[in-house]
């Protein structure tokens, strides 16, 4: 119970937990109406059987002006009917509100999780698999709220109904009520002892199988070409089928375990009630008929609540694993968010100054830059010192594993240095990452393109009505994409599919270049951004970028040496250190490894 309370406090933070308490108060009110309706049975039966009007009957009669017996029966009948009408109406209202409230909070939790994932440090993000994120924000959240939270609320509601009716029976007929309470308590304990472990097991299987099925789906979709070419489609289908069937079978077993009490308890209940009625008849004789009827009425009302209560416990057990995983994710990300002072998820997207009105010249300095991954003792980069003047171009060259991409991630601000600083006009970029990001146009080797139009792909993150069509066309022209786009069915409004499947690899890279230029950046960073281009197209784009403005600082990572032939500075990296720096010709003369690369590339001097 304490654990469930803690989870509810986390799943419904702040004032939302107060609303949850209000929901419980509403459930208690419904229980009182039900008790009032059931309690009204006793005076009706007593009056109908000619019992003397005394005690509480006399008090009620005096309240209504001492009416005759028939009128009193009608009064209690109206109370009974009104009590059940109000109980039904309140139940519907509370149920509708409760379902909406829980569903809304489930959605809010999923959004907050994604917000945390999107704002966490890049290093932490790299450790998470896509499947784990999808399972957390979708499946864990759904199972935790739909099964665990709703299960707890339903359990509380049914428990209150049973408790109120049992209190009424204890007041009116204590011994039979105690016997009934003991009997059903033992039955409940026995059932839960049998079903608890099995419900938890099925919940664990559902969680693990769902994660496996999601992984299998992502692998199958992302690896489509290789899977088809290697003729292993059946294997990937089998992996997905196995996990999906595990999940379906576990869900089926969980549902069966939740329904099992419904059928078994009916039999157990009838046997128990029959025994108690026989006991009351023997010990009290015919005078106990009204009380027997009341007892039967109360028990008939208790049975469905009792069945639903036990089933709700099964739901809670089934959702326990998902709720534990969700709690762990929320706690971990919230702690991370507090440390990094992450903002909450926005209610609506902001409209930022997406296009920089002017290019603000940027000087970049790397001071004693060292970086190690948290799980490694060996630094990837060691004592990097470099000055990149405003409006100049620099290229990072080196073999695989030399640290080029890590250095770019540090300059971008995605990684924080282990020691040293990246300075923007003399100020550490880590002190104002949003401002730094705003000034950068970044083109990775593998450009991310959502299922969108050409216009949306260039004006990344903006709605069509928010983007500048004239600037979109201008950037497409610089990226040598005008003819390609005009050949499409709907021009810049053509849907190009996820990862721009309608375009070639080179065209996707050019689309990435157009996107980076759309923001009118002060710094353009190109990480193998022209690797899929032919020499002629690459040359045209390079010349076009040079003509845009001499104020842009350009940083290039490339293996193809033709890309970096005319940069102002060429930096050769080896084993995480700068071993040579200068013009292309100077580095060629200083460094034998680079000179050998030039010879292998057959580049003219």
Protein language model annotation of sequence segments:
Residues 23-86, 170-175, 182, 285-289:
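Transmembrane helix-loop-helix hairpins at lipid-water interfaces of multipass membrane proteins
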Residues 23-29, 153-205, 275-289:
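Transmembrane helices of ABC transporter permease
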Residues 80-87, 184-186, 262-265, 269, ...:
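Hydrophobic alpha-helical segments in the permease module
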Residues 118-163, 222, 246, 260:
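Juxtamembrane loop-to-helix connectors within ABC transporter transmembrane domains
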Residues 228-232, 256, 301-334, 338-342:
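Cytosolic ends of transmembrane helices, especially the final helix of ABC transmembrane type-1 domains
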Residues 412:
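Helix-to-loop junction immediately C-terminal to a conserved catalytic motif
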Residues 423, 430, 437, 455-498, ...:
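ABC ATPase nucleotide-binding domain helical subdomain, centered on the C-loop/LSGGQ "ABC signature"
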Residues 441, 446, 457, 475-478, ...:
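ABC-family ATPase nucleotide-binding domain "signature/switch" substructure
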């Amino acid at each position: 119970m304490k654990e469930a309370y803690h989870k509810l406090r986390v799943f419904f933070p702040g004032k939302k937990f107060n609303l949850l308490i209000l929901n419980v108060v509403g459930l208690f009110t419904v229980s009182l109406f039900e008790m009032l309706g059931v309690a009204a049975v006793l005076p009706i039966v007593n009056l109908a059987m000619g019992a003397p009007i005394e005690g509480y009957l006399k008090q009620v009669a005096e309240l209504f002006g001492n009416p005759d017996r028939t009128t009193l029966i009608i009064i209690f009948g109206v109370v009974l009917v009104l009590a059940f009408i109000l109980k039904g109406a309140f139940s519907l209202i509370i149920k509708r509100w409760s379902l909406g409230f829980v569903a809304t909070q489930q959605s809010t939790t999923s959004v907050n999780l994604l917000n945390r994932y999107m704002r966490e440090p890049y290093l932490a993000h790299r450790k998470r698999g896509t499947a784990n994120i999808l399972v957390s924000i979708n499946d864990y959240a759904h199972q935790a709220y739909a099964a665990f939270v709703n299960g707890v609320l339903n359990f509380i509601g049914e428990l209150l109904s049973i408790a109120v009716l049992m209190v009424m029976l204890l007041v009116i007929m204590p011994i039979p009520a105690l016997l009934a309470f003991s009997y059903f308590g033992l039955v409940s304990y026995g059932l839960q002892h049998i079903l608890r472990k099995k419900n938890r097991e099925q919940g664990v299987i559902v969680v693990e199988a769902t994660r496996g099925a999601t992984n299998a789906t992502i692998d199958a979709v992302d690896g489509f070409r290789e899977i088809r070419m290697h003729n292993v489609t059946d294997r990937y289908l089998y992996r997905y089928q196995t996990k999906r069937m595990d999940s379906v079978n576990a869900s089926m077993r969980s549902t069966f375990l939740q329904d099992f009490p419904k059928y078994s308890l009916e039999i157990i209940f009838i046997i128990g009630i029959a025994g108690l009625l026989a006991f009351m008849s023997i010990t009290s004789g015919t005078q106990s008929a009204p009380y027997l009827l009341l007892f039967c009425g109360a028990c008939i009302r208790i049975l469905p609540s009792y069945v639903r209560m036990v089933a709700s416990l099964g739901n809670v057990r089934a959702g326990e694993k998902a709720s534990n995983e969700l709690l762990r994710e929320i706690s971990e990300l919230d702690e991370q968010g507090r440390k990094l002072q992450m903002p909450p998820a926005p209610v609506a997207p902001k409209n930022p100054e997406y296009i920089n009105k002017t290019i603000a010249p940027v000087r970049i300095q790397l001071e004693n830059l060292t970086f190690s991954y948290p799980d490694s003792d060996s630094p990837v980069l060691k004592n990097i010192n470099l000055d990149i003047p405003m409006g100049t171009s620099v290229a990072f060259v080196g073999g695989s594993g030399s640290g080029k991409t890590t250095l770019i991630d540090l300059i971008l601000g995605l990684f924080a240095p282990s020691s040293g600083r990246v300075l923007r006009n003399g100020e550490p970029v880590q002190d104002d990452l949003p401002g730094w990001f705003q000034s950068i146009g970044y083109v990775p080797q593998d450009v991310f393109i959502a299922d969108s139009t050409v216009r949306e792909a260039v004006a990344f993150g903006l709605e069509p009505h928010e983007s500048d069509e004239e600037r979109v066309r201008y950037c497409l022209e610089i990226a040598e994409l005008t003819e390609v786009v005009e050949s499409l069915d709907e021009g810049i409004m053509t849907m190009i599919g996820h990862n721009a499947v309608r375009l070639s690899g080179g065209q996707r890279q050019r689309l990435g270049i157009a996107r980076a230029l759309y923001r009118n950046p002060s710094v353009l960073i190109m990480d193998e951004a022209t690797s899929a281009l032919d020499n002629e197209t690459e040359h045209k784009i390079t010349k076009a970028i040079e003509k845009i403005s001499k104020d842009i600082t350009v940083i290039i990572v490339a293996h193809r040496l033709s890309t970096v032939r005319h940069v102002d500075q060429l930096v050769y990296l080896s084993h995480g250190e700068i071993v040579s720096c200068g013009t292309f010709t100077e580095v060629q003369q200083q460094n034998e490894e680079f000179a050998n690369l030039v010879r292998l590339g057959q580049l003219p001097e």
